[in-house]
Amino acid sequence: LHLCDRRQRQMCIRDRLKRVKQETGMYVATEVATAKHVYECLKAGIDVLWIGARTTANPFAVQEIADALKGVDIPILIKNPVNPDLELWIGAFERINNAGLKQLGAIHRGFSSYDKKIYRNLPQWHIPIELRRRIPELPIFCDPSHIGGKRELVAPLCQQAMDLGFDGLIVESHCNPDCAWSDAAQQVTPDVLDYILNLLVIRKETQTTENLGELRNQIDDCDNEIIEVLAKRMRVCREIGTFKKEHDMTILQTGRYNEILDKRGAQGSLCGMDSEFIKKVFEAIHEESVRQQMEIINK
């Protein structure tokens, strides 16, 4: 809720949120960036606090907040840092958890990028997915408003988050979005939000059926084959590394590397795969090949 301009917000938000809580009986939440914010919110009886993306990116600021929270166990949500750094995100949870807080949750709001063609902040879904793998008990919420940056993207992003098994959503809503003092383009009216939520398909994490189990066995077989082929490729790469060492050749052969990326990208496209995906796969393979050849040359 944008109830006051930025200069007045620090003074009025406490009283406004208290009023909202009293009149509606709803839980209220707000962002904190300093120890002073924490003390004011605790004094006002705010139910939930969240740490913003720019604050998460600053370990010193997170530690200041953690120190201010010692002795209480209020729910704390932590947005991902602006840059795609999972370890930095996890580090923020560790700092807050070490202060004695146990009710923690994550907010995925996307990552800053120069590429603004579609999203305001790139989703990079693999990062929150890896967070879930690393900390499976941690609730993860999606912020489609900040990811999309445009209200027409809110609905599809909400559904995508639900399809990926996110635990909830944090959506910006305003009674008159075009008049909002900040982020107007990404806000929706309460009626539109209600419409979006009612259209959501919530899928279940069902138990494995016999047919699904068979398909997963096929995936396991494919993965085993991929590992074996990669191991064979790395053996050949090490032989090439030995040859380069004996003939005083540089490890990086740019022409050959570009040829591989171009040809494999084209092959992938013919097989129905995205060329950018294939490029990333072979970039990772090349990086490991270079690492292994470096070990050989430096022996």
Language model features: what each stretch is:
Residues A57, A61-Y195, L199, Q207-T208:
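Catalytic alpha/beta core domains of metabolic enzymes, predominantly
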Residues C4, T30, C142:
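Active-site flanking residues adjacent to catalytic metal/cofactor-binding acidic residues
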Residues Y195, E205-K299:
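Domain-level signature for soluble enzymes in the chorismate/prephenate branch of the shikimate pathway
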Residues I46-D47, D167, D223:
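Receiver (REC) domain switch/active-site residues of two-component response regulators
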Residues A29-A33, G52, K79, E276:
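Structural motif
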Residues L1-I13:
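Single conserved hydrophobic/aromatic residue that forms the stacking wall/gate
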Residues A33-Y39, L153-C158:
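Short, acidic/polar
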Residues V48-N58:
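Acidic, His- and aromatic-enriched active-site or binding-groove loops in soluble protein domains
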